[in-house]
Amino acid sequence: EKNFVWNLTQEKRNTNRHDGMYVFGDYCYVSYGLRPNSDEKKAKGEFKKEDLISEFQDDIPRRKYIEAKDIYRYKINKIRFLEYGTDRSPAKLVRPTFKEWFDISKLYFNRLGILVGTFDYDNKYLHNDSIIGAALWKDLNGVENKSITSSIKKFSTMSRFEMEQLSESVDLRFLLGIMNSKYASVLLTNLRGGDYHIYPEHIRNIPIPTATVEQQSVIIALVEKILNTKRINPAADTSMIESEIDAEVYRLYGLSDDEIKIVEGR
């Protein structure tokens, strides 16, 4: 019993149950988004977040923009528009984040409470630092900056080339299905203990089971079904499909029937 990853006592939380697996950060670069207020050194007091955000698209250059309060599991509830491509944004932002980050496919996760994730289909959203974004390493090939270099140095056990190669083997929709599963919530609890916050390091260290193309395709098809349903009707109940994903996830992690009952609260 000491190896059961779902045990929630502090003693048993530090388990090595899935030590042989790659972790999420081996597949994805994980980062906060931009901070849309003026940099204290470059433009002290010139503008605040509210000055850059509009409910509507207008003549000012803008991009679609989301915050954590706008997302939920498999959906984006609200979109606003952030000034972007002007003299002050992103040039004078306190944290602009590198521009290539906003032009590739990403998963988005919240930073407080229960983990929820969604998917940027068309690489079209800016997001602020209330959201943790994740992009496959392969999609950042050729992008060089201090943020990426520092992240690899601090958090990675693999080389960038190795992670880029590894990320060729997964689909973001597969990872989304894993991360939105009940078991991922348990794994997150194991990592953060009683903390209400979710940090990039928590996301990076969630173990991810290796899956064949066929195994991934099952989860991808279910995720696509949910995403398509939510696009048509954001309020649609997709709990049955999510339960199907949970069942696939349990198999990939090799959970026993008894462990599944614990995760399911039965």
Spans of features found by a protein language model:
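Amphipathic alpha-helical segments
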Residues: 207-232
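Domain-scale recognition of functional cores that engage charged ligands
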Residues: 1-2, 7
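Conserved AMP-binding
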Residues: 240-266
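Ser/Thr-centered flexible coil motifs
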Residues: 7-11, 212, 256
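Hydrophobic face of alpha-helices
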Residues: 176, 220-223, 242, 246
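Short, flexible/disordered secondary-structure transition segments
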Residues: 186, 190, 233-234, 259-260
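Short, Lys/Glu-rich amphipathic helical modules
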Residues: 230-240
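Polybasic, glycine- and aromatic-enriched phosphate-binding surface used to engage nucleic acids
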Residues: 12-214
